[in-house]
C-alpha cells in the first residue's frame, strides 16, 4: 500500500482520481520511508514521499529518484515510460 492514503486509487493511469483531498491535505505525517508510491499527484509526491521527491508527473511505482513525464520515451540512461531509474538521468534532464 502506498502512503498519503492513496493506496486504494487503483492503477496509475490518469493520475489519482479517487484520492482528491486525501492527497491534498493528508500528506503531513505518516508517510515515513515509503517504499511504494502509486497514483500521487506531483505536489503530494514531492512533499510527502521521499522515494518520489522531484517527480515531474505521473506516478512512482518503485522507489526511484524522478518520475518522467508521460510523453517521455526511452532516452538510454535508465528512463522509460514510467520512471527514471537512475539519479543521474534526472539530473541530466534527458527525460524530465
Swiss-Prot record:
Keyword set, alphabetical order: Keratin, Repeat
UniProt keyword Repeat, yes or no: yes
GO cellular component labels: intermediate filament
Region 14 X 2 AA repeats of CG, annotated ranges: 4-80
Taxonomy, superkingdom: Eukaryota
Protein family: Belongs to the KRTAP type 28 family.
Function: In the hair cortex, hair keratin intermediate filaments are embedded in an interfilamentous matrix, consisting of hair keratin-associated proteins (KRTAP), which are essential for the formation of a rigid and resistant hair shaft through their extensive disulfide bond cross-linking with abundant cysteine residues of hair keratins. The matrix proteins include the high-sulfur and high-glycine-tyrosine keratins.
Note: Human have a similar number of genes as other primates despite the relative hairlessness of humans.
Name under which the protein is recorded: Small cysteine and glycine repeat-containing protein 7
Organism of this sequence: Homo sapiens (Human)
Source species taxonomy: Eukaryota, Metazoa, Chordata, Craniata, Vertebrata
